[in-house]
Amino acid sequence: MRPASHLALPSSLCVALAIAAAALVFPALASAQQPATPVLLDAMTTELHRAFTSLGKTAAAGDDKQLPPYFLSYAVSEATYVGIRAQFGALADSASNHVRSADVQVRLGDPKLDNTHGTHRASAVNSMELPLTDDREALERTLWLATNAGYGTALDNYLRVKTEAQVRAKEEDSSPDFSQQTPQTYIGKPAPPVVVDKAVWERRVTDLSKVFRDYPDVYQNVVMLTVQNETDYFASSEGSQVVTPHLATRLVAFAVTRAEDGMDLFRAQTFEAETVDGLPKQADLEAAMRELGKSLEALRKAPVTEPFDGPAILSGRAAAVFFHEVLGHRLEGQRQRGDEEGQTFTKEVGKDVLPTFLSVADDPTRTTFGSTWLSGSYEYDDEGQKARKVDLIDDGVLKTFLMSRLPIANFAESNGHGRAQSGRVPTGRQGNLIVTSTKTEPESELRKQLIEEAKKQGKPFGLYFEDISSGFAVTTRSSPQAFQVIPLVVYRVYVDGRPDELVRGVSIVGTPLAALKRILATGDKSEVFNGECGAESGTIPVSAVAPAMLVSEMETQKQAQGTSRPPILPIPGAEK
């Protein structure tokens, strides 16, 4: 569970870490020993037991106006963080904070039908800020208040659910509303408070943002450092007690320009580590900032591409985003249940959904890929279930889905993927989505095959997608089952031997079932996409790993284009 974002930039539904908010949940750290129960967890357990054994017990038998809960849980996120932000060589913000937030989940009825049924899932959770000190009485009173509020909401919604059940037609999927799971116990060592030399890092972040002064066409830039140490506490009426620490450091650089025709263009880059000591050296960071500035200068001069339908190569990172958007969201368990969901893959279990040389797993237990930290890692999910690797697709054949404790037809239990932002009910979500291939080629060979495929189709060029920022996946029945992915750096690869040409204004569009089966081959090296993903259970950190991919047909359309002119007044000092 992650608290609300801090020092956040605007983001789309699923946004690459390069432009995402900086406060994230990161991989859990294994404890060397089982420490004593923290005061906070002890207070949670005590008040939870008192509430669970008391609520609804004073009502007369059969009185729906007061019902005992069949399940009660407390999930508390405690985080300390430091955030530093600079732009154009000046410090814009420097802050430290300490927060504790509690999510109280109350379920009334029974696992087969409870207050969360159908469109009422949000009624399970009530959130409240907790005292920052280990004052047991203050903690227990605050949890008591949150529990009472949550119980009232749950009771109102349970009565609505029972009424609706009398008038609704038979549901396609009549699975229960909550799965039975084995209680979990793991008491990790709480994360220490963040300790950062703010003066040193304020200077370093400011110096990095100053690099963009050398690029007059960069109209906006932000460099942000966020260091967050978080501890998640979970206790339930089933007997689960889980404490897991999460440490994360992220440096984000973001820059924007505008072409003469009014099109806004941006580039971004992130650097991640467990602590600030793991970040690159300052000289390497400054070189990366200069590369961003140069790429924006080139992009604003690049031609706008026309709509295209032909062969393309996705770089490893671009392919990772592509799989996250096009496939990953549609394999989340709750997408297979509900009258409003498109259920693209619900009835495809046991069938080929990818070429036979591709397999896909989601493994939140993996913390790194090579030397890159995977931000979607965790030890226990936000329902207190142990994280586990899930083999979703094996040799092209769909095997299972990403499951929370919401059952679906033929899949009755969680597989450790119930995730949520504070204040939301956990749902099945991606962690570290990893794509592997048995049909690999060196990148140079993929390029040759791209040119051959373009010639075969009578195209003057193919496309190479080097970098992608974000995407949007539509999974509901009320809209077409389509996706849109926004590339940042795209090249035309000409069949006649001309140099590759940088272009702009491209969006990748299509439908998932068709797009996924057009993959012809993959590269022999994989790359990582780290990002934030938003859905009904909030914004959470995710990762995806994939090799470069050659696709026989990739459809693109023009991006929406602004009409605002570049700044009329030159930047200060330009006249000198």
Segments from the language model and where they lie:
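Hydrophobic alpha-helical bundle architecture
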Residues: 436-514, 530, 534-536
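Short clusters of small/polar residues that mark proteolytic maturation junctions
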Residues: 267-269, 403, 504-505
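Active-site bordering "gate/hinge" segments
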Residues: 29-380, 385-388, 394-397, 410, ...
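N-terminal secretory signal peptides that target proteins for export/translocation
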Residues: 1-11
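Bacterial N-terminal signal peptides
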Residues: 10-28
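Short solvent-exposed loop/turn micro-motifs enriched in small/polar/acidic residues
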Residues: 305, 382-385, 426, 456, ...
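C-terminal, non-catalytic macromolecule-binding modules
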Residues: 399-453
